[in-house]
Curated annotation (Swiss-Prot):
It comes from Escherichia coli (strain K12). The gene is yqiJ. This is Inner membrane protein YqiJ. One of its GO terms (biological process) is DNA damage response. It comes from the Bacteria. Residues 1-11, 87-101 are periplasmic.
Length: 209
């Protein structure tokens, strides 16, 4: 089997995508951000999906148990690996690769199954932006530090909260209408807007906290 043959193109592309995401995540961490957290923040509409086949599919893929970016990388990685292995098996048996019109759907099917079971195994070991030490509702009334560049009403940025157990949580915070948060601001979380977004105000006790 020739790894870089044309019949392996879609699978090599998928593996390259995983490597690219890894590089982008490293770059984002160097800049003080979390690419996975940013993606999850833009998936608030998942919270409104409570019934139907879409909800079942998302649950099967462990969306919610794992960060969305991790699920995406698992999908791409397994698809690339399974596709290459299937084509290799075909060459070993029939001395010729099969058409990707057949191999791609089969690879997708095995990929979905692999992601489901792998996700269930690794989910307890994946660090999330929240912890079981306190619930998300308990963030309200806590002080946080703005770590993103800038936030305005409707356009949140990342903030860092350290709970009473010393654990760090990264949240998306935004100010009230007409206010602006900038990097380094200390803010008070006052209410929850969605699964990942919170409303905050500037530190009302700057002389104390």
């Amino acid at each position: 089997m020739i790894l870089f043959a044309d019949y392996n193109t879609p699978y090599l592309f998928a593996i390259s995508f995983v490597l690219l995401i890894g590089l982008l995540e490293i770059f984002a961490l160097i800049c003080g951000h979390m690419l996975s957290g940013a993606l999850d923040a833009h998936l608030d509409h998942y919270d409104s999906i409570t019934t139907g086949h879409i909800s079942q599919a998302l649950h099967y893929l462990n969306i919610g148990r794992l960060p969305a970016l991790v699920v995406l990388c698992l999908l791409a990685g397994f698809f690339g690996l399974i596709g290459i292995l299937l084509q290799h098996a075909c060459i070993m048996v029939w001395q010729s690769p099969l058409s990707n019109l057949f191999v791609v759907p089969v690879s997708l099917l095995f990929t979905i199954i692999a992601v489901h079971y792998t996700g269930k195994i690794v989910a307890p070991w994946i660090p999330r932006d929240h912890s079981s030490a306190i619930t998300e509702e308990e963030y309200i009334g806590s002080m946080a530090l703005i770590t993103g560049h800038q936030a305005t009403s409707g356009n949140p940025c990342e903030g860092k909260l350290t709970d009473q157990f010393g654990q760090i949580h990264y949240l998306l915070l935004e100010p009230e209408e007409g206010k602006i948060f900038t990097k380094g601001d200390k803010v008070l979380i006052i209410c929850r807007l969605s699964a990942t977004r919170y409303l905050a105000e500037n530190n009302p006790w700057p002389q104390i906290l």
